[in-house]
Amino acid sequence: MPRKIWTGSINFGLVTIPVGLYAATEDHSIQFHQYERGTTDRVRMKRVNERTGDEVGYNDIVKGREVGGVLVAVEPSELDEIAPKLSRTIDINTFVDLNAIDPVYFQKTYWLAPGSKEHFRPYNLLRRAMDETNQVGIATFVMRGREYLTAVRAEDSVLALNTMFFADEIRDPGELVGDASSVAKPSDKEIQMATMIIESMSGDWEPEQYEDTYTARVEKLLEDKAEGRAPEVEEAPAEPSDVIDLTEALRRSVDQARRGRGGQVPRQRDEEQDVSALSKAELDKKAKELGIKGRSKMKRADLEAAVAESQGSASGGRRRRRAS
């Protein structure tokens, strides 16, 4: 069960809905400690005086910033006095069309859950009303001493809260591209070919088909080194080629897309599939089909080995039955 990080209520009009706030995502990045090379001794960081090199106690540290060439020191108590007070309400002050908000404004996503069973009815009322009108509620609230601009929106079965950037935090993209969009205009033929490529590559959004391959490689590196095996070296990706003739590059891409749609290599039988080429979702599904026990606790390398072994046994059994 995710940990509740904030408790309060959503207010819109005269309706109040008690809710709890939960993180919608989790970070699977591998965290390393620092050690002195050749030892098992952890390395610790100390706060030291830049001029004297002496260690400084936590209570002797103040925050500060230069203003007009003068260092202004600020005490923690002074910051506490002007900090926004903890809010227990998410007061929706306006509803806007979801499509009117540029995704660049969205920062982080949280789930909002009803405070208790008796609050499900008003909770679902707000969720369904926003879903049917494609509206999101704009509100501000305070969490962990900081004021957030937020958008409360409807998902399939839950309310989501997105923290948002304020307008002055969004950088102007015009500083990067200038008037390139009006000067370097593509021809109608180029647009047509680019559209054909996009259409040939179009598909459904299936997020489970994508995985963090770098984290998986780091896990395998650690496992290999722990077991005394030589780490596998990843091949360097091919160097990107410079686009000399845009029209020719588009034409080749269109031809390649057509060949890809019409002349795909037949897929191997399931029992002969190279498990290393499977995505994590496909690997989990295959393990479930093969009835591999304890799969939920296995690391990818162990799961690959178990699936490969199970596939080999199943394939061998089928061949023996055919031969008989």
Swiss-Prot record:
Biased composition (Basic and acidic residues): 281-292
One GO molecular-function entry: double-stranded DNA binding
Domain Ku: 10-193
GO biological process, one term: DNA recombination
Family membership noted in the UniProt record: Belongs to the prokaryotic Ku family.
Summary of the function given for this chain in its UniProt record: With LigD forms a non-homologous end joining (NHEJ) DNA repair enzyme, which repairs dsDNA breaks with reduced fidelity. Binds linear dsDNA with 5'- and 3'- overhangs but not closed circular dsDNA nor ssDNA. Recruits and stimulates the ligase activity of LigD.
Oligomer and partners: Homodimer. Interacts with LigD.
Descriptive protein name: Non-homologous end joining protein Ku 1
Source organism per UniProt: Saccharopolyspora erythraea (strain ATCC 11635 / DSM 40517 / JCM 4748 / NBRC 13426 / NCIMB 8594 / NRRL 2338)
